[in-house]
């Protein structure tokens, strides 16, 4: 049975990380850049690389089938170790994941990623949970989220990267400032 999965855009197929040949080609890409002197890598939505079974279960929006999947830690560990980038800076963008899972990805003893970043703090001004419909930010909630994530990551020996926005978000000055 064949299918075409595209979580973000119909022109961007999700790679089948269950296929060992795909994983080997991704390792070759990393080796290519490493040989040219790159000192680190940012992995986009890396926690979505392992998919669960979709068989006849259509409840919800489907995130539980493609977020933090059954082989994600195995695949990241393999990628990092087989390419020799264990000591490089590696940061993974995390979509729809939890503090506990971010700790797993970045805990130094697990030897997966050096740091992660997630978007929980950027939802404090979403109107009706919609990214492009904004309201005044809830600064108390923002402060609480930062505090909980920083203390939680520290306690779990993880490391999260702090940021205000990226290409997936409305401009920061439009949200938290005055143009």
Language model: regions and residue ranges:
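Active-site and adjacent substrate-binding regions of carbohydrate-active enzymes
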Residues: 1-179
């Amino acid at each position: 049975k064949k299918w075409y999965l595209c979580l973000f855009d119909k022109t961007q197929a999700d790679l089948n990380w269950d296929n060992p040949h795909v994983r080997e080609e991704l390792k070759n890409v990393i080796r290519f850049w490493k040989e040219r002197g790159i000192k680190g890598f940012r992995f986009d939505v890396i926690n979505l690389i392992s998919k669960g079974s979709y068989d006849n279960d259509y409840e919800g929006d489907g995130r539980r089938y493609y977020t933090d999947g059954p082989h994600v830690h195995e695949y990241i560990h393999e990628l990092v170790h087989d390419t020799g980038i264990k000591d490089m800076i590696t940061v993974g963008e995390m979509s729809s994941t939890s503090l506990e899972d971010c700790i797993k990805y970045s805990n130094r003893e697990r030897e997966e990623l050096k740091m992660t970043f997630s978007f929980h703090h950027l939802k404090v001004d979403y109107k009706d949970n919609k990214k492009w419909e904004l309201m005044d930010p809830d600064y108390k909630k923002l402060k609480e989220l930062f505090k909980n994530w920083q203390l939680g990551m520290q306690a779990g020996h993880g490391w999260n990267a702090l940021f205000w926005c990226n290409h997936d978000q409305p401009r920061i000055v439009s949200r938290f400032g005055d143009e």
